[in-house]
């Protein structure tokens, strides 16, 4: 195996030259990547990797892209969680079809009464022979409408403190006991779903981690969610044209479609400056001051993303840079919307086909969507709590019910 980055790049280049064919389907190409170990080079050899240091991932993906081939595989949040938490039976069943894109996943954590406090969930799982029977409701579930499997948290023991009686399951989504309903938002999009489970069934062994100890696995997923949010998506520019690229673009478009309204679109500093110039507002000292503030926030966000990338390359578990990055993105989104609003004035609230609507109505959409950035993936308040406790060493918020069986807490 290559000892240096240069050797590694050469090895990858030789393999891609021998195996990349743009006429392949995306699934066929991913099968080759996964079989070779280049799909997830830092994963253990047993689990479709090369056993390389974490820094090798970015080197390999960069070199594959330089060879005009597709480097991205849909690792998602389930991939690293299952890899870390196991057990082997779950790894053997789910990791390969996850990496090839054969099976699509969604996250089933939040509930109507358990959002920021996910551990307060009330969805139940009761063992019935060789299956778990699931009853409850989840909410804010991205991609649940076309997912094959769900990362599900459910309560399996009510007579212990709330964090101790949770189990992390793999839920088959395509079954009679699972109903998915779109959730309409104030910006008129339905980017999320509600999922209702009525006597849904899960095989007994489809548990990530251990029964009643699913909170540790859930924390792993949430840490990866914050980190991946700072790292960005797949790079498809410069890829050889063909079926694989067309399918990869369609897949990326579908994944991005539910987020198309997200205020990251407003965080593009270049677009904000371009809009200010087009409206004759670029010389306004107040607007220039706010644009300067946006540029500062945006660069700080980029540096945080660089720290997240460095942490991953050095093999360090997800740390506070995920929460810092999440907060930075929220600040950038709000500031960008503020600048747009200052430039447009009251016209900014015009939407739809109104001929006076700025940016063809996109600005109104952004203004209505910005609050979501501070909520989705963990509220700003949750990120502040994480940083205060894990970075600054401040005491946790007092909880008079801590340590009591959750059954008593719910009835109190």
What are these regions (language model features)?
Residues 1-75, 83, 90-97, 104, ...:
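Amphipathic, small/basic residue-rich leader segments at the start of a protein or domain
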Residues 101-109, 153:
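A short, Trp-centered hydrophobic/proline-enriched beta-strand micro-motif
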Residues 130-131, 135-183, 193, 219:
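A short core secondary-structure module
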Residues 123-126:
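A structural signal for short hydrophobic beta-strand segments in well-ordered beta-sheet cores
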């Amino acid at each position: 195996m290559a000892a240096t980055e240069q050797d590694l790049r050469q090895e990858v280049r030789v393999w891609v030259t021998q195996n990349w064919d743009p006429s392949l389907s995306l699934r066929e190409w991913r099968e080759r990547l996964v079989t070779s170990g280049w799909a997830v080079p830092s994963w253990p050899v047993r689990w479709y990797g090369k056993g390389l240091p974490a820094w090798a991932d970015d080197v390999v993906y960069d070199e594959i892209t330089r060879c005009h081939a597709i480097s991205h595989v849909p690792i998602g949040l389930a991939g690293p969680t299952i890899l870390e938490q196991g057990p082997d039976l779950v790894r053997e069943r789910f990791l390969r079809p996850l990496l090839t894109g054969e099976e699509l996943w969604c996250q089933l954590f939040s509930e109507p009464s358990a959002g920021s406090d996910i551990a307060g969930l009330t969805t139940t799982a009761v063992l019935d022979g060789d299956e778990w029977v699931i009853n409850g409701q989840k909410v804010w579930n991205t991609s649940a409408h076309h997912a094959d499997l769900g990362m599900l948290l459910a309560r399996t023991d009510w007579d212990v403190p709330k964090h101790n009686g949770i189990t992390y399951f793999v839920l088959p989504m395509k079954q009679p006991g699972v109903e998915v309903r779109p959730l309409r938002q104030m910006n008129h999009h339905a980017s999320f779903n509600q999922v209702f489970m009525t006597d849904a069934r899960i095989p007994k062994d489809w548990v990530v981690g251990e029964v009643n100890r699913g909170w540790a696995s859930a924390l792993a997923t949430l840490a990866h969610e914050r980190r991946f949010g700072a790292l960005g998506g797949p790079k498809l520019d410069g890829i050889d044209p063909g079926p694989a690229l067309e399918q990869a673009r369609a897949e990326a478009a579908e994944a991005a479609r539910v987020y198309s309204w997200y205020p990251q679109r407003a965080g593009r500093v270049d677009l904000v400056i371009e809009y200010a110039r087009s409206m004759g507002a670029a010389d306004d000292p107040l607007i220039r001051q706010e644009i300067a503030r946006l540029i500062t926030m945006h660069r700080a966000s980029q540096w945080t993303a660089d720290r997240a990338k460095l942490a991953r390359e050095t093999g360090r578990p997800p740390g506070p840079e995920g929460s810092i990055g999440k907060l930075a993105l929220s600040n950038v989104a709000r500031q960008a919307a503020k600048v747009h609003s200052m430039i447009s004035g009251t016209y900014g609230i015009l939407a739809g086909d109104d001929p006076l609507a700025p940016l063809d109505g996109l600005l109104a959409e952004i203004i209505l969507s910005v609050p979501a950035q501070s909520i989705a993936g963990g509220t700003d308040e949750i990120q502040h709590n994480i940083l205060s406790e894990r970075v600054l060493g401040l005491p946790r918020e007092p909880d008079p019910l801590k340590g009591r069986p959750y059954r008593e807490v719910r009835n109190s």
